[in-house]
Amino acid sequence: MRLMIIFDLPVETSEERKEYRKFRKNLINEGFIMIQYSVYVRVCVNKKSAEFTEKRIESFLPSKGVVQSLILTEKQYNDMHFLLGKKIKEVRNSAERTIIL
């Protein structure tokens, strides 16, 4: 499963920029990878794990803006089409079950 976080946060004041940086840093610390600006994704073992991660994200939400989550199966995530640009080739972002180092 994949948990995708999509957000649009205001960055007009220095306090808003600080909240944006803190939120982004917390997402990265939770194991999320940026696939586009303001779109982050993380691999989760199952739906329960994804829902648990959603709850953890609720604990560090910024005070303003829009933050949405989307839980996807591996098949749904792999059906994503790149109309322009290239897929991120990062090991943590791989759908493969076995990784040989």
From Swiss-Prot:
InterPro entries in UniProt: CRISPR_associated_Cas2 (IPR021127), Virulence_VapD/CRISPR_Cas2 (IPR019199)
GO molecular function, one term: metal ion binding
Organism expressing this protein natively: Ligilactobacillus salivarius (strain UCC118) (Lactobacillus salivarius)
Protein name: CRISPR-associated endoribonuclease Cas2
Gene Ontology terms describing biological process: defense response to virus; maintenance of CRISPR repeat elements
Lineage of the organism: Bacteria, Bacillati, Bacillota, Bacilli, Lactobacillales
Function recorded in the entry: CRISPR (clustered regularly interspaced short palindromic repeat), is an adaptive immune system that provides protection against mobile genetic elements (viruses, transposable elements and conjugative plasmids). CRISPR clusters contain sequences complementary to antecedent mobile elements and target invading nucleic acids. CRISPR clusters are transcribed and processed into CRISPR RNA (crRNA). Functions as a ssRNA-specific endoribonuclease. Involved in the integration of spacer DNA into the CRISPR cassette.
EC number: 3.1.-.-
Swiss-Prot/TrEMBL keywords: Antiviral defense, Endonuclease, Hydrolase, Magnesium, Metal-binding, Nuclease
